[in-house]
């Protein structure tokens, strides 16, 4: 069904189109993550998790043409332990001239050395966004997450280097309680809609819908079951970013954590006491004795710097000056939505 208002509003709120029966316009069909055909491995403890992750990595590496994306965090560091010696590990490094931004390459290099991997840096520039966003949104049939540019560029480099598969640590946070902010308290429905929405659509769009069903279906006696929301709704959105970027680059993607499932109820008391991803951390500490797990950081992308001077959207669907008080992430979502609407005009 064609519904530009719904799709625009839903993207700003959730970074995806939750109702997969809807599209922006006739002839441009969004691509979504297709669930795996086999059921996920049930994980009760860190030993179950280790066994499943190791098998997934070994399976992906059988052909000898597999690389890994290695950040400074613990999720990909764990996977690196299972890679064959001499494998290539890519780390993203965003570059903003004259400004120091988050740099994970130093910590990632330590993991690479520990695991006997060849460490390579993929530098990301603003010009990559201008160059690759049109390609990514055309392939996706929808606006895309900002991380897709980095994933796509790494995929292109990996293909150039002779690889056919790249491994990511995606979905560990979703399945094992890494999203501490979302799990920090019990949320009422209205509270969580406000908390989760990336951009409230009425802040940007003249015609909008409040898309609440992705959250209200996880309501239990007035409270939102956030863990279930994360590992269903957020999981599909997040995995869709990796599959779209890698498909567009012409490389297979493997996300071993995505093939697992926390079998027992998540211990929210431990998460809220500062012990997020307690099963994953236990595994990291076992594989890297003596290492101190670094603070969790999102995939680096200095959108605050890149969008600091952006004047906002010019299309008639948007309110003038709507991005004036938005942060960099919010400005990016409005910017890429406008880019996608421009693309749709060429497809009529």
For the regions a protein language model found, what residue spans apply to each?
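Hydrophobic transmembrane helix bundles of membrane-integrated enzymes that assemble
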Residues: 26-38, 43-46, 52, 77-82, ...
């Amino acid at each position: 069904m064609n519904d530009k208002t719904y799709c625009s509003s839903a993207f700003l709120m959730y970074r995806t189109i939750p109702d997969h029966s809807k599209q922006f316009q006739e002839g441009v069909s969004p691509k979504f993550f297709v669930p795996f055909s086999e059921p996920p491995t049930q994980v009760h403890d860190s030993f179950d998790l280790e066994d499943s992750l190791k098998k997934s990595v070994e399976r992906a590496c059988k052909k000898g043409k597999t690389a890994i994306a290695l950040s400074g965090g613990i999720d990909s560091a764990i996977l690196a332990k299972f890679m064959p010696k001499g494998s290539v590990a890519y780390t993203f490094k965003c570059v903003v001239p004259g400004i120091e931004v988050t740099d994970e390459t130093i910590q990632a290099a330590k993991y690479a050395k520990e695991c006997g991997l060849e460490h390579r840096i993929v530098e990301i520039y603003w010009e990559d966004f201008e160059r690759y966003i049109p390609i990514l949104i055309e392939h996706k049939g929808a606006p895309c997450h900002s991380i897709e540019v980095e994933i796509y560029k790494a995929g292109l480099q990996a293909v150039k280097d002779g690889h056919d598969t790249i491994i990511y640590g995606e979905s560990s946070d979703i399945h094992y309680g890494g999203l501490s902010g979302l799990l920090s308290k019990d949320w009422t429905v209205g509270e969580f809609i406000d908390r989760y929405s990336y951009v409230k659509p009425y802040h940007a769009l003249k015609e909008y819908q409040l898309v609440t069903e992705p959250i209200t279906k996880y309501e239990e006696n007035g409270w939102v079951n956030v863990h279930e929301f994360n590992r269903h709704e957020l999981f599909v959105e997040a995995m869709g970013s990796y599959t779209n970027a890698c498909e567009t680059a012409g490389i297979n993607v493997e996300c071993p954590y995505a093939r697992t499932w926390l079998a027992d109820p998540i211990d929210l008391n431990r998460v809220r006491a500062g012990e997020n991803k307690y099963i994953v951390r236990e595994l990291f500490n076992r594989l890297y004795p003596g290492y101190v797990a670094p603070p969790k950081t999102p995939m680096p992308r200095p959108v605050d710097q890149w969008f600091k001077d952006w004047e906002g959207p010019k299309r008639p669907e948007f309110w003038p000056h709507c991005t004036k008080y938005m942060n960099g992430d919010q400005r990016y979502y409005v910017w890429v939505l406008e880019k996608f609407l421009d693309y749709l005009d060429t497809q009529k």
